[in-house]
From Swiss-Prot:
UniProt organism field: Bacillus licheniformis
UniProt keyword annotation of Secreted present: yes
GO biological process, one term: killing of cells of another organism
Subcellular localization, as worded in the UniProt entry: Secreted
pH-linked activity: Optimum pH is 6.8.
Protein name in the entry: Lichenin
Gene Ontology annotations for the cellular component aspect, listed alphabetically: extracellular region
Temperature dependence (free text): Optimum temperature is 39 degrees Celsius.
Coiled-coil spans in chain: none
Length: 12
């Protein structure tokens, strides 16, 4: 599950 990480990374 990298959805949470993706969101954070993309949010940056």
């Amino acid at each position: 599950i990298s959805l949470e990480i993706c969101x954070i990374f993309h949010d940056n």
